[in-house]
Regions:
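Residue-level detector of flexible, active-site-proximal loop/helix-junction positions
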Residues: 39, 75-77, 131, 196, ...
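Catalytic core of membrane glycerolipid acyltransferases/transacylases, capturing the structured
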Residues: 42-129
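A short, well-structured juxtamembrane/interface segment
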Residues: 19-44
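A generic local structural motif
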Residues: 30-35, 56-57, 112, 137-138
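Soluble or luminal CAZymes and related metallo-dependent hydrolases
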Residues: 11, 15, 49-52, 131-135, ...
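Non-catalytic C-terminal accessory region of glycerolipid acyltransferases
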Residues: 2-7, 134-260
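Short, charged N-terminal beta->alpha structural module
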Residues: 5-21
Length: 260
């Protein structure tokens, strides 16, 4: 039986991504308003975020204040045929509710070619729903040891992407527990909410998994606590907020300075 390949901490070094990055930057050129409730952010931390459809990960890659390694669907690390099928059938049709047809198939086929370069540049590692999750946890520990934060999107998006999250999977809880078992340190976990449509990013104060372990909560219950906190950020700071316009605010500040 062939030995399974060990995952390495991604460096983000990719010549193709350097070529593609200006396109990504143009697509997400509208800088979000960052509401930082946490103050100075730890470099070594876990971050749990909503996905904001396909837009959250690239937007956070560009605008989150700390360097991160990200968890991504393992299907996106397969061959071109597997990536195309996943993007067409799961991502576009099932989750984004796009109509099946040649346009959706062509879009999936084209983006499946670009995906490996983008994933590599964004420092993504594959995550799994089976025993192979151990590989993801192992490489995530190595990333934390290198003072990189680990950004995880734990929402259950099987029925699509929604503003209000219905469930968090507990993989991030397992990572925090593993770090605590190895290092004796209760690593900070930052709940955040990203709205690409309104151009708002909210970063909450860190929470700590061991606080809830001591209360007798299991992994799934702890994951629900964090899910509720992320939803709370949406209701408090995003739901009724107007679309943020960075350029308009910049002009207004410039005008205010001149008038003084």
């Amino acid at each position: 039986m062939a030995k399974s390949k060990e995952l390495k901490v991604p460096t983000g070094k990719s010549v193709m991504y350097l070529i593609l990055k200006p396109i990504v930057q143009f697509a997400y050129r509208k800088k979000p308003k960052i509401i930082n409730l946490a103050g100075d952010l730890e470099k070594k931390a876990i971050i749990v975020s909503n996905h904001s459809a396909m837009s959250g990960p690239p937007s956070l890659e560009l605008y989150y204040p700390v360097k991160t390694v990200k968890w991504g669907a393992h299907e996106m690390f397969g061959n071109h045929k597997a990536r195309t099928a996943y993007m067409r059938d799961i991502l576009y049709i099932k989750k984004k509710h796009m109509k099946p047809g040649w346009k959706t198939s062509l879009k999936a086929w084209l983006l499946a070619w670009l995906n490996p370069f983008i994933y590599k540049g964004m420092k993504n590692v594959p995550t799994y729903t089976d025993a192979r999750l151990g590989k993801t946890l192992k490489v995530s520990i190595k990333a934390l040891e290198q003072d990189l934060s680990v950004l995880i999107f734990p929402e259950n998006s099987n029925d699509g992407y929604f503003d209000v999250l219905t469930q968090f999977f507990p993989g991030f809880v397992m990572l925090a527990e593993r770090w605590y078992a190895l290092k004796g340190e209760d690593i900070p976990v930052y709940p955040i909410y990203i709205s690409v449509s309104k151009h708002i990013l909210v970063i909450d104060k860190p929470m700590y998994v061991q606080d809830y372990v001591k209360k007798g909560l299991n992994r799934y219950q702890i994951a629900e606590v964090f899910k509720d906190k992320v939803n709370d950020l949406y209701f408090k700071y995003v739901k009724d907020a107007e679309v943020y316009d960075y350029k308009a605010e910049k002009k207004a500040l410039k005008k205010a300075k001149k008038s003084k």
